């Protein structure tokens, strides 16, 4: 397949049997999404199939008419897209959108369609299907929306489901629920599943077969057991080495070495004391307390709605606590005038989750990084220029990047720019809000290594907000587990992960993909079998 003059998929072949699952694994640009679009005949204008064929139940998809394919696509092939927030129309009720899918069933009445929709919602584990039917997408959680999309995909009882990164934005426990749902539907309905992911841990645990792609070429493929236990390509081994769930000591050895170095006992850099916050009748944070030592990394973990985001907003002064106290350095965050707070805020900077949305696409990198200096009135023009160049160099980017716009940068380069923007103020604390969740695994490794280096060189304190517990275990010194706005457990990360006391923490840890269990012939192999 080529887009214009650029070939993006080269001589890729694989077979997927009835009732089996195959994971296409690769980073951005590997060609995995193009393959999915080819199977579904969703290639954009300008794309050309240079050779080969896609055969589905003996039919060459490229050669059948549009009418034949629409019928095939509506009844025999289902698609679960990556982002349910973008896949569903936000201004139309779920039920209205579900009826568009139900029409392919050619039932006798709208009432019958509604009944089938409600039955399908119940089948995919949505409690109170009637409420879901009446709801708008913004009224449902990410996990609920993903279940809706899965329900719409399986409603016509297709023989193939193509799932494009269906769990990439979900909390670890919701991720497990969604993957378990796929397993159950595959088993009960005899579905074949083409699973597209960059997460080798999920693929190894959940798929019967794996195909590893890079730059549009298959690096290797085979059963999950074979590819995972004895990879033959250097690229697959590199992917394995960079996945925290597969290689538990990928970052931990660096982290422990850093912590054994001599360090002055400087006390706490962040001290959160009995903080509470409500929005109307909703208790967002209730009596939350934790402390972070200078130069250390503290993780906040929990599912959506646990209070992580509200806690961060309180720390940054974007919300005011109803009660309690927050101290950063030697200054209290709450109770200050605006001018006093600006002085505190200079030493407390945020790195956002998604570098594809957190950078203004119309600005050049130099302006993006300089913006905090302009906002706080730091230095003259020459000093600001020098500090921007210093920040760019510190994150490992060449200075010529200053003249580029975000569209000309890769995901990893964009996140480095976001980190440079935070560093330009020379802060004491960085709040890292899921800083690697939108990145491929090898790019994630580069960013984590960069953060370790900066912390060691600059003595930074990190507050790391994440739902990736396998990563938290490796990079954090201490951790606070939040549920429904309350602290359920906290302490040294090794202690919490080794012997969690609270059932909620135990459930979170249990939901981490267990890569020691890989699949062969549809059954899960325990560690002793591999």
Q: Where in the sequence are the language-model features?
A:
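Conserved ABC ATPase signature
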Residues: 135-140, 144, 405-409, 413
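Helix-to-loop junction immediately C-terminal to a conserved catalytic motif
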Residues: 40, 44, 316
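Conserved ABC ATPase "signature" region
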Residues: 60, 112-131, 383-400, 509-510
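Conserved ABC transporter NBD signature motif
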Residues: 48-60, 324-332, 344
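ABC ATPase NBD coupling module
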Residues: 61-78, 96, 104, 225-231, ...
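ABC ATPase "signature
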Residues: 218-222, 230, 490-491
């Amino acid at each position: 397949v080529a887009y214009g003059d650029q070939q993006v998929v080269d001589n890729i072949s694989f077979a997927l049997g009835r009732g089996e699952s195959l994971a296409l694994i690769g980073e951005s640009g590997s060609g995995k999404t193009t393959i999915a679009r080819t199977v579904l005949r969703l290639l954009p204008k300008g794309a050309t199939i240079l050779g080969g064929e896609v055969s589905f139940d003996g039919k060459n998809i490229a050669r059948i008419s549009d009418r034949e394919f629409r019928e095939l696509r509506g009844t025999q092939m289902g698609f679960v897209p990556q982002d349910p927030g973008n896949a569903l129309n936000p201004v139309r009720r779920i039920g209205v959108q579900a009826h568009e899918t139900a029409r392919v069933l050619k039932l006798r009445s709208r009432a019958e369609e509604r009944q089938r929709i409600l039955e399908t919602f119940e089948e995919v584990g949505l409690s109170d299907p009637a409420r879901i039917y009446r709801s708008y997408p913004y009224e449902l959680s990410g996990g609920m929306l993903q279940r809706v999309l899965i329900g719409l995909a399986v409603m016509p009882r297709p023989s193939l489901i193509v799932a494009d990164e269906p769990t990439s934005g979900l909390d670890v426990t919701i991720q497990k629920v969604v993957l378990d749902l796929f397993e159950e539907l595959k088993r009960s309905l005899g579905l074949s599943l083409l699973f597209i992911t960059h997460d080798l841990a999920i693929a190894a645990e959940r798929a019967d077969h794996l195909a590893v792609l890079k730059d549009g070429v298959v690096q290797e493929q085979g059963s999950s057991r074979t590819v995972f236990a004895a990879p033959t390509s250097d690229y697959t081994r590199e992917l394995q080495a960079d996945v925290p769930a597969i290689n538990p000591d990928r970052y931990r050895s660096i982290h422990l070495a850093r912590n054994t170095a001599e360090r002055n006992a400087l006390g706490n850099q962040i001290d959160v004391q009995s903080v509470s916050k409500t929005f109307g009748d909703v208790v967002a944070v209730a009596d939350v307390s934790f402390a972070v030592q200078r130069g250390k990394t503290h993780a906040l973990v929990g599912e959506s709605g646990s209070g992580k985001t509200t806690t961060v907003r309180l720390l940054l002064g974007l919300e005011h606590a109803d009660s309690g106290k927050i101290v950063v350095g030697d200054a209290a965050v709450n109770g200050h005038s605006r001018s006093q707070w600006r002085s505190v805020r200079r030493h407390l900077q945020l790195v956002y989750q998604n570098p594809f949305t957190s950078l203004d696409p119309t600005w050049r990198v130099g302006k993006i990084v300089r913006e905090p200096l302009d906002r706080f009135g730091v230095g003259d023009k020459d000093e600001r220029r020098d500090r921007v160049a210093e920040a760019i160099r510190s994150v490992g980017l060449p200075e010529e990047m200053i003249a580029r716009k975000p569209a000309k940068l890769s995901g990893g380069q964009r996140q480095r720019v976001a980190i440079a923007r935070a560093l330009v103020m020379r802060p004491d604390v960085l709040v890292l809000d899921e800083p690697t969740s939108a990145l491929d695994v090898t790019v994630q490794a580069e960013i984590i290594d960069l953060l370790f280096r900066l912390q060691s060189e600059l003595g930074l304190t990190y507050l790391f907000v994440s739902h990736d517990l396998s990563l938290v275990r490796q990079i954090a010194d201490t951790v606070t587990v939040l549920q429904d706005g309350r602290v359920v457990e906290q302490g040294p990360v090794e202690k919490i992960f080794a012997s969690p006391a609270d059932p909620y923490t135990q459930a979170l840890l249990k939901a981490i993909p267990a890569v020691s269990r890989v699949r062969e012939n549809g059954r899960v192999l325990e560690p002793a079998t591999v």
